[in-house]
Amino acid sequence: MAEEVEEERLKYLDFVRAAGVYAVDSFSTLYLYAKDISGPLKPGVDTIENVVKTVVTPVYYIPLEAVKFVDKTVDVSVTSLDGVVPPVIKQVSAQTYSVAQDAPRIVLDVASSVFNTGVQEGAKALYANLEPKAEQYAVITWRALNKLPLVPQVANVVVPTAVYFSEKYNDVVRGTTEQGYRVSSYLPLLPTEKITKVFGDEAS
């Protein structure tokens, strides 16, 4: 039995199955509630429900089989590409996947923070949580990309330009804040020193 359960798990698209189960469960709960409050229409609802069950039951497992097929196709493609893709690109994609896995947890933290403390405090908490993580992943990704051909040469041009425009943006935000525009006081300043330190040092 345990082998069958393990066989049912999808390697890449398990989130699709989980979303489907959640959607069906939510719809079922809503449907049962509506059915309970239908009052005199309940016998008609039961008749329609039996007809729908008769029609849907034969095709119920087709979407799951389609997702399994796509999952196996993705697995075959990934396995065949595994020997062709350079290790640097594999490393970058693994790090990107790791960042993507952290996203739902961060969103839940922010949502609970906004609910408990309000929007402004929630936004500050979001920035405080995201800034170190974003900086860490930017450095990791940058170092991995910097190993690819031509990236260091392009970086020598792009990094100074990014720093220049970041400083211009910061000047505009500071200026409009001093002039009394409240919206500007909520805009974050870009950390030009960090950009120069992280990306400039790596580019040279």
Curated annotation (Swiss-Prot):
GO CC, one annotated term:
cytoplasm
List where in the cell it is found.
Cytoplasm
The record's keywords, sorted A to Z, are: Allergen, Cytoplasm
- Which superkingdom does the taxonomy of this entry point to? Eukaryota
Claim: Cytoplasm is one of the keywords in the record: yes
Regarding tissue, the record states: Highly expressed in the specialized vessel laticifers, but localized only in the laticifer layers in the conducting phloem. Also detected in leaves.
**UniProt xrefs under InterPro entries:** REF
Cystine connections: none
Q: Name one Pfam family in it.
A: REF
Record carries keyword Cytoplasm: yes
Give the induction note. Answer: Induced by tapping. Not induced by wounding, ethephon or abscisic acid treatment. Induced by ethylene.
PTM annotation: Not glycosylated. The N-terminus is blocked.
Tell me the protein family, please.
Belongs to the REF/SRPP family.
How would you summarize the oligomeric state and partners of this protein?
Auto-assembles in solution into stable nanomultimers of a globular nature.
The UniProt function text for this chain reads: Involved in the biosynthesis of rubber, an isoprenoid polymer (cis-1,4-polyisoprene).
Protein name stated in the entry: Small rubber particle protein
Per the UniProt record, the source organism is: Hevea brasiliensis (Para rubber tree)
